Amino acid sequence: MEDQETKRITKKPSRSIIISLKDIPPLDPSSIPSMKPMAQDHHNVGMQRFQEKTDFKFEEEDNAISSFSNIQIDPNSTRSISLEKKLAPKPDEEHTTTTKPISKDDESKTRRGSAKSVLHEMCASKRWRPPVYECCNVDGPCHLRLFTYKVMVEIRDSSGKTVLECFGDPRRKKKAAAEHAAEGALWYLEHVKTKPHQ
């Protein structure tokens, strides 16, 4: 009876792939979303509320004076303030030279989120089992622990079942180590698995 059960299990083709992040090329810095804060639209809210409650109205400042408020002046400087106003750049010039149209690929990369969440969403969309994270190695003394995580993804497709194991680099925090392992699994699924076998 046991022989029949083992025969059933061995009939299904099973592969195991182990990937170390040391073999993977480094990430392209342009693919990492920037950490710039969102533009603040509420810079004059206090002034508007003040004007609503009182009859006092302020005169509008021109671009040179408003941009002058952002300039730091050295107290030891002998230059006059009027000269500083003339040297202040116009805000329109700054925005036209530094902004570029954002493509759909850039928008999707900035909205993706953490590697763990993207990997989980990818597994759910393809109806695979959710990824399993496991701490496989703990090194160092108790005050300088380094955690190494691995992520296991069971890939089911027409050719059978493949178990993908990706190991991350040792990190000081468990969350960062698991995130690094998830990045390796994502890299494999996006670059290697999508290409046809040659």
From Swiss-Prot:
Domain DRBM stretches: 114-191
Keywords: RNA-binding
SUPFAM superfamilies found in the cross-reference section: dsRNA-binding domain-like
GO MF terms, alphabetically ordered: RNA binding
Region forming the signal peptide: none
Cited InterPro entries: dsRBD_dom, RLC_Component
Compositional bias annotation for Basic and acidic residues: 85-110
Pfam families found in the cross-reference section: DND1_DSRM
Region (Disordered): 85-115
Lineage: superkingdom: Eukaryota
Official protein name in the record: Ribonuclease 3-like protein 1
Natural source organism: Arabidopsis thaliana
Source lineage: Eukaryota, Viridiplantae, Streptophyta, Embryophyta, Tracheophyta
